Amino acid sequence: LIRSRGLGDVYKRQIITSLRPPAEVVEAAHSYGGLVFHDVINVRHAKKAADMGVDGLILVCAGAGGHAGALSPFALLREVKSWFDGTIILSGSIGDGYSVASALALGADFAYLGTRFIATQEANAEPEYKQMLIESSANDIVYSNLFTGVLGNYLKPSIQNSGLDPDNLPTADKSAMNFGSGGNTDSKAWKDIWGSGQGIGLIEDAPTVEELVDRLKSEFTEASSEFNTKAKIL
């Protein structure tokens, strides 16, 4: 798709950074015209990244899959929007076209979907992982820092399958971050313990990416139309 639309060079220039100060990456990327977008979970992190010259901020809000913050998108996006002039991308529980439309209505430039695309035919994920996403709901998400030292959202059944009690997980030492293992467990984060956002209640199948994108576009159009109708009434 990227090659057919001549977007290869565009996407090569987009760099996403996370979990460490992006200054070095910004300097390197800007030397050849690249753009850097940095993951943040609060205003303090956002201001630090902005001061380092990032081109955009990815607001990883409550309910996002994997490493995620705990702030409402309403609070974080609107506050960041009040002082940041760069690109703002919203992440967290965005699983359909209605969610995308809501993100843009709130003031985001782009909506960031992650978990929903894991449950697609092309995704390089275990079939069991995809099926677990289809069968689970928001009630099956556990927010813990045990597995990497950083708080994140994970699928409860995958934690149970690793022999752990998802309702009684200890708290890890966040100063000992380890993104390649399971932290204080024998299970490995991402390999055995699967990340997921809270929006999985909307996942009912694993279509092709093309089918999913078409569906998102249709839902986005429906949501926009409904919003415009309600706005006229108000």
Question: Which stretches of residues belong to each language-model region?
Answer:
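Single conserved hydrophobic/aromatic residue that forms the stacking wall/gate
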Residues: L1-Y11
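Catalytic beta/alpha-barrel core
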Residues: K12-P21, L35-N42, I58-V60
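Hydrophobic residues within beta-strands of alpha/beta enzymes
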Residues: I15, L57-I58, I88, A111
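Glycine- and other small-residue-rich loops at beta-strand/loop junctions that grip anionic moieties
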Residues: I15-S18, H38-D39, G65-G69, I89-S93, ...
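Short beta-strand/loop segments at the ligand-binding rim of alpha/beta enzyme cores
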Residues: E27-I41, W83-S91
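Glycine/Thr-rich beta-alpha phosphate-binding loop at enzyme active sites
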Residues: D39-R78, T120, A125
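Conserved active-site-proximal phosphate/metal-binding subdomains
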Residues: A75-I89, G95-L234
